[in-house]
Structures are given as structure tokens and as C-alpha cells.
Design a protein with these regions (language model features):
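N-terminal amphipathic/basic leader segments beginning at the initiator methionine
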Residues: 1-8
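Glycine-rich phosphate/diphosphate-binding loops that line cofactor/substrate pockets in enzymes
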Residues: 10-26, 50-51, 124-127, 197, ...
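Short glycine-rich or small-residue beta-strand-to-loop segments that form or flank ligand, phosphate
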Residues: 24-35, 58-62, 133, 253-255
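Long, charge-dense
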Residues: 56-105, 308-326
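C-terminal non-catalytic interaction/assembly regions of soluble proteins
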Residues: 268-326
Length: 326
């Protein structure tokens, strides 16, 4: 893997000709659910290299709960807590437009035929000299692979974008999505980026890692202003983060780190990330010592408690009958 000095040197080479000209910089960083991403190390290095800049740190939370002072200190020890801004997916967003229904229908092969609203945190439209989006490319149940434009449109997105793209991913079947670079949701993100944020000065710092406990190995770091870095990172993540089994598993035990997983909403990744390996009729045992609620926020928690987890077809019928699910 890459050692810390190699990572620092790569970042310095990528931006050393630019950062003397920067005065306002926005770091877009992951929350505690990505503690093995090496994002904390990278963000702290950037913060130290930019003493002449005003640096704001936007937490790409999506619908997740904001990071506590303690979590920020653990993950980003060199960055003062007052520099962090917790993204609020309900209040902090501006609507830019929508990805047309025709495009959505085409990429989903007709599974979804409605437009996707495009809403992002208003800070992404502020007068920053550079936005540095930092995170890990890893298999994801909605987008196929996490990060790149997803970090802006979901991590820093609004309810309309998050809800529509998650529904699109569900309608397209997780088995066709998980671990793939080219998916219907990814194509929607790419189109939204092309249509609505073509001139935003964003650069991507994308890691591919594996971990045993808290021992993180960085297999690759991809720095780019376009999509090529993501494409290469996704290929490496498929190699490092997807495990193929010789035969289906009849029993599996998953332990959810209590520092990362405090809700069933997040803990369901234990299901998403094992289901293609499980035998029909197999047993999945989930040890979740930190899970204390269903949803990441109060409204989502209420809806899950009211309607439960019922499978795709049943949920679609519920959506037809109940306004609060639309």
C-alpha cells in the first residue's frame, strides 16, 4: 500500500502550482461512516498546507446525522471544530433544475419515468477558488460505486435528489448495481454534473482502501478534475473491495462497528453487501451493538417505524396509497 509520505507527496505535486493563488477553499469530507477512507489524513494535510486561506469544511452527510465534536476530533484532529459545516439536506440546498424524465427512462430501461430534481448545498455555488472533494471509492448499493459526483448530489444534496436517486437505484435492482461503475444512478449524477455544475472548480481526491480493524491500507489515490480518476479508482475498488466466494454462504455473521453504525438505515449495509453471496434460505446474523434507531433523522425514523421493511413491490404499493412516502 501507499504510505503517508507518498500520499502527502502526491497531493503536493497535484496542487503545488495552484494553492498559492487560492484564498477561499472548501473541503468536502465524509462523516464517521467512512472512517477507513483515509480522508481525515488527506483533509488535515490540506488544511496544514493552506494557512493563507480561509478553509471551510463541509460534511458530506447526505441524510446522516451530523458529526459530533468528538467524532470530528477523532477523524480530523488538525482542523478546528468551528471550521466544520454540517450539511442539512432539508434546509441548506438550492434547486438547480432537473434531469429530464426521458433521460431517466432511457438509462433505467423504463423502470423509472420521472425527472430527478437536482438540489445541492448552496456552499457549492459560493465563490470558492477551489472545492476539494475527498472520499473513498467503494461498492455502493445505490450508485454502484460511491463518490465522485455522488459526493455532491447525495452527500451535499437535497431531499428531492436523494429520494429520487435512491428510488431509481432500488427499482433497477441492487444485484445489477452493487460494485459496478456504470449504473443508471451514476449516469444521472454524471448528467447532473454536466448540466448544472460545469464551471464549479471542483477537484476530486479519491482513495481505494482496505482495512483490518483500524489498520488501513491505501491501495490507490486518484487526483483529478474530471471523471477519469473515478473510472480508474472504481476499477481498483472492484479488485480490492469485492470478494467472490466459491459457493453460496449458508450462514454469515456480520459485526457492525458501533462507531460507524448507529441506525438500521446504515446497518442495512450488512444485508446489501452480503446478499449476493448468501445461499437461498441461508442465515445472516448481524451483531449491531451501536444501532439505537431505525432512521438517521426523526422523520425517516417515524416512516420506517410506521411502514417497516416490506420488499420492493410492497413498498411501491404503499407509495401509491400514502402521500407521506412520496
Amino acid at each position: 500500500g501507499l504510505d503517508d509520505e507518498s500520499l502527502r507527496a502526491a497531493v503536493d505535486r497535484a496542487y503545488e502550482d495552484e494553492w498559492d493563488r487560492w484564498r477561499r477553499v472548501l473541503l468536502v469530507v465524509p462523516d464517521g461512516t467512512r472512517r477507513h477512507s483515509k480522508a481525515g489524513f488527506l483533509a488535515c494535510h490540506l488544511y496544514r498546507r493552506l494557512p493563507h486561506c480561509r478553509v471551510d469544511v463541509l460534511e458530506a452527510l447526505g441524510t446522516h446525522a451530523p458529526m459530533s465534536r468528538e467524532t470530528c476530533a477523532q477523524l480530523y484532529p488538525d482542523i478546528p471544530f468551528d471550521r466544520f459545516i454540517a450539511h442539512d439536506w432539508r434546509q441548506d440546498v438550492v434547486r438547480l433544475g432537473e434531469v429530464p424524465a426521458g433521460f431517466v427512462a432511457e438509462v433505467s430501461q423504463g423502470r423509472m419515468e420521472r425527472p430527478v430534481p437536482v438540489e445541492v448545498n448552496r456552499l457549492l455555488l459560493s465563490d470558492y477558488d477551489r472545492i476539494l472533494s475527498i472520499g473513498q471509492v467503494v461498492p455502493h448499493e445505490v450508485a454502484g460505486m460511491a463518490n465522485h459526483a455522488k459526493n455532491l448530489f447525495v452527500g451535499c444534496g437535497g431531499a428531492g435528489t436523494i429520494n429520487a436517486t435512491h428510488m431509481l437505484g432500488a427499482l433497477c435492482d441492487m444485484e445489477r448495481v452493487m460494485g459496478r461503475e456504470d449504473t443508471p444512478v451514476r449516469r444521472v449524477f454524471d448528467e447532473a454534473l454536466r448540466r448544472f455544475l460545469p464551471s464549479v472548480p471542483v477537484s476530486w481526491l479519491l482513495s481505494v482502501t482496505t482495512a483490518r480493524g483500524d489498520d488501513v491500507t491505501v491501495h490507490g489515490l486518484f487526483l483529478s478534475d474530471g471523471r477519469e480518476g473515478f473510472r480508474r479508482a472504481a476499477a481498483l475498488a472492484q479488485e480490492k473491495n469485492v470478494i467472490f466466494v466459491d459457493r453460496p454462504l449458508t450462514r454469515a455473521v456480520v459485526h457492525l462497528d458501533e462507531r460507524e453504525f448507529q441506525s438500521a438505515w446504515l446497518g442495512n449495509k450488512a444485508v446489501y453487501r452480503t446478499r449476493m453471496a448468501m445461499a437461498d434460505g441461508g442465515e445472516l446474523i448481524i451483531l449491531a451493538p451501536g444501532v439505537a434507531r431505525f432512521g438517521e433523522d426523526a422523520q425517516a425514523d417515524r416512516l420506517i417505524r410506521r411502514y417497516g421493511y416490506a420488499g420492493r413491490d410492497a413498498v411501491l404499493r404503499l407509495c401509491d396509497r400514502h402521500e407521506d412516502l412520496r
